[in-house]
Amino acid sequence: MSEVFDLTCDLISRPSVTPEDAGCQAMIAARLERVGFTCEHLHYGSVANLWATHGQGAPVLVLLGHTDVVPPGPIEAWTSNPFIPQRREGKLYGRGAADMKGSVAAFVIAAERFLVAHPGHPGTLAILLTSDEEGQAIDGVRKVAETLRQRGQRIDWCLTGEPSSSERLGDLLRVGRRGSLSATLHVKGVQGHVAYPHQARNPIHLAVPALAALTGRHWDDGDESFPSTSLQISNIHAGTGANNVIPGALEVAFNLRYNPHWSAPRLESEIVALLDQHGLDYTLHWHRSGEPFYTPEGKLRRIAREVLERFSGAPPEESTGGGTSDARFIAPLGAQCIEVGPVNASIHQVDEHVCLADLEALPDLYQLLIERLLAEH
């Protein structure tokens, strides 16, 4: 087929279920070093990270991706083995084909071609890969970003290869992301027999008004760039499984996706104040996954729009929707961040795939973006 097809297949065949890398980064580093990249392997705990750079000085463009994948689930549910790439009906099937080994392969091919055409390019081209994007995201880009911050590393632009397209390659340009804040609420009650409720304190009954207030709260109206903040309860657990026992405790997990009108500390304070109004005996544990970020109108967005329109045939939708990405750790370094990648319809699903035509186009798309940012005068 082609270089990008072969490299994507090579990556898919390595079962790098998070936080495993399965040799993906070593193989990529060897290729990058052959064309003049300086490669640094940053290992934190069980996580592999690769920081590869070519050139020097400003501006600095980072291509950001991950080599880990989500578990495939039952192998028998797949039409073909998820770690044996298979080409069928114009698509390449395998775990990571769309999220995001196809993009990583395209990054490498685009970088190689760019350096052939522009060996003495201005500024710095960097590639940052991690094996901890799909998992806890603690020892991956989060930790690398802190290392880069301590070194005083400047980053001007970050291009993340997450599968951002909706129906066709390049139809959507991700220009920001909402923040993510998770919490686990533990409500204490008193266990007892359901026939003697006066001898017990049912934590479910006690918590229901507070949970109703939480889910009914109108946080904000959003704005032209971000949707409104939302809170969703994801898990509730209480009881022994018997229908004649009042539980002694309740556990509720919930998550907020919030726009820049809020910060994590403000949201935490608001929720604590709301819970305190209901007189619960509770504890609350928070996990801050990342603050929101937004790339304003400027050179990066303008060039990305022009390039995507060339490939998709129409101007892209510019969006801040969807979940989180590792760009949330790069944005606080002062970088403007966008996300451009293949269609996301099959990601994290059985029979994940990428359209072969899109895969073949990705290196050209990324190379043009790199050239417009680093080599255009």
From Swiss-Prot:
Give GO terms for biological process: diaminopimelate biosynthetic process; L-arginine biosynthetic process; lysine biosynthetic process via diaminopimelate
EC number(s) of the enzyme? 3.5.1.18
Pathway assignment reads:
Amino-acid biosynthesis; L-lysine biosynthesis via DAP pathway; LL-2,6-diaminopimelate from (S)-tetrahydrodipicolinate (succinylase route): step 3/3
Where do the annotations place Zn(2+) 1 binding?
H66, D99, E162
- What cofactor is needed? Zn(2+); Co(2+)
Q: Does the keyword Cell wall biogenesis/degradation apply?
A: no
Family membership noted in the UniProt record: Belongs to the peptidase M20A family. DapE subfamily.
Q: What does this protein do?
A: Catalyzes the hydrolysis of N-succinyl-L,L-diaminopimelic acid (SDAP), forming succinate and LL-2,6-diaminopimelate (DAP), an intermediate involved in the bacterial biosynthesis of lysine and meso-diaminopimelic acid, an essential component of bacterial cell walls.
Assembly notes: Homodimer.
The name this protein goes by in its record: Succinyl-diaminopimelate desuccinylase
Q: What is the lineage of its organism?
A: Bacteria, Pseudomonadati, Pseudomonadota, Gammaproteobacteria, Lysobacterales
Q: Name the gene behind this protein.
A: dapE
